[in-house]
Design a protein with these regions (language model features):
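Interfacial/gating helices of multi-pass transporter permease domains
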Residues: 17-37, 104-108, 168-169
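Short alpha-helical transmembrane segments in multi-pass integral membrane proteins
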Residues: 54-119, 163-196, 200
Length: 200
């Protein structure tokens, strides 16, 4: 479901950018899509692994072990987010070169990716909180957050690109802000859960 919503969001981004900003911007977004999915897939793999560990402890009703697992998973998620963000941002020019992105659209690609991947900690936060919620039996909240984020992303795309003229940077910023909203919603719902009791 998460991937389906990501597809909807990405297709909306592509349609808006292509219609308003033209062929070069559209080509840039299409070119970096594989990088975007690689980063997202890595983050999802990490956080889903944490979710499996937490769900096992939660299902076994081992509250002390559960608390420790959540603490260590949270710490590792923070460390991974920091290292991943720094590494990706430093390595972006080289990565774009390895992928043989056409020279004329490289600046557009980098403008988009620097803003988007500056929000990697927020991607990690959303996916981590979503994984924790699923581990506790709540699969509705992550989906709701994802749908809300997709709608906000489209609205912000139109505002930042049409009204403010921020180009592909505006499209990337819209995604980061939408991710922030999704993260905040999931974090709030997670704070309401008493881990000693099953969710309903």
């Amino acid at each position: 479901r998460r991937q389906r919503q990501m597809c909807i969001r990405d297709r909306a981004d592509t349609a808006i950018v292509g219609k308003i900003l033209g062929v070069d911007a559209l080509a840039a977004l299409g070119t970096v899509e594989s990088i975007n999915w690689l980063v997202l897939g890595t983050i999802q793999g990490i956080t889903q692994g944490f979710g499996i560990l937490v769900s096992q402890q939660f299902g076994a009703k081992k509250e002390e072990a559960l608390q420790e697992t959540i603490f260590h998973a949270s710490f590792l998620a923070v460390v991974a987010a920091i290292l991943f963000t720094v590494g990706i941002l430093i390595g972006l020019p080289g990565l774009v070169g390895i992928l043989q992105v056409p020279v004329d659209i490289r600046p557009i690609c980098l403008d988009y990716l620097y803003v988007l991947f500056g929000g990697i900690p927020l991607m990690m936060l959303y996916n981590f909180t979503a994984a924790m919620l699923r581990a506790f039996g709540d699969s509705k909240t992550p989906l709701t957050a994802c749908v809300i984020a997709a709608l906000f992303n489209i609205a912000l795309d139109l505002y930042f690109i049409l009204e403010l003229g921020w180009g592909v940077k505006g499209a990337a910023l819209a995604t980061v802000i939408a991710q922030t909203l999704a993260s905040a919603y999931c974090l709030w719902k997670l704070s309401l859960i008493h881990i000693s009791e099953p969710t309903r």
